[in-house]
From Swiss-Prot:
It catalyses: 2 superoxide + 2 H(+) = H2O2 + O2. InterPro entries: SOD-like_Cu/Zn_dom_sf, SOD_Cu/Zn_/chaperone, SOD_Cu/Zn_BS, SOD_Cu_Zn_dom. It comes from Drosophila persimilis (Fruit fly). One of its GO terms (cellular component) is peroxisome. Destroys radicals which are normally produced within the cells and which are toxic to biological systems. GO terms for biological process: determination of adult lifespan; positive regulation of mitophagy; regulation of synaptic plasticity. It holds the Pfam family Sod_Cu. Residues 58-68 have a biased composition (Basic and acidic residues). The gene is Sod1. SUPFAM superfamilies: Cu,Zn superoxide dismutase-like. Zn(2+) binds at residues 54, 62, 71, 74. This is Superoxide dismutase [Cu-Zn]. Its EC number is 1.15.1.1. Keywords: Antioxidant, Copper, Cytoplasm, Metal-binding, Oxidoreductase, Zinc. Residues 48-68 are annotated as: Disordered.
């Protein structure tokens, strides 16, 4: 998270077949919905510009987290209250911490809006 916003996100997966639990907290986000995505590259030298597009190794269309046809990096939105910490609590069965499609080493982007 760049700018005045900051936060920490944790990814946990018990086995390669298990869903990934995403938890964490963001501070300083403006009130409202913020897109929450894994991007292709782990490069943050130029902020989000160097992180590349959403992680999409299977060349799918952009979609909601519950859609079968979606980028692997499409994790939906998080809701910020604006005056308190923003909780992140997502369980996702498409992303993985194992194998060729692993999200390890990539960038998590919290967008300015949904």
């Amino acid at each position: 998270i760049n700018g005045d916003a900051k936060g920490t996100v944790f990814f946990e997966q018990e086995t390669s077949e298990a869903p990934v639990k995403v938890t964490g907290e963001g501070l300083g986000l403006a009130k409202g919905l913020h897109g929450f995505h894994v991007h292709e590259f782990g490069d943050n030298t130029n902020g989000c510009m160097s992180s590349g597009p959403h992680f999409n190794p299977r060349n799918k269309e952009h979609g909601a987290p519950t859609d079968e046809n979606r980028h692997l990096g499409d994790l939906g939105n998080i809701q910020a209250a604006g005056d308190s910490p923003t909780a992140v609590s997502i369980t996702d069965s498409k992303i993985t911490l194992f194998g060729a499609d692993s999200i390890i080493g990539r960038t998590v982007v919290v967008h300015a809006d949904a």
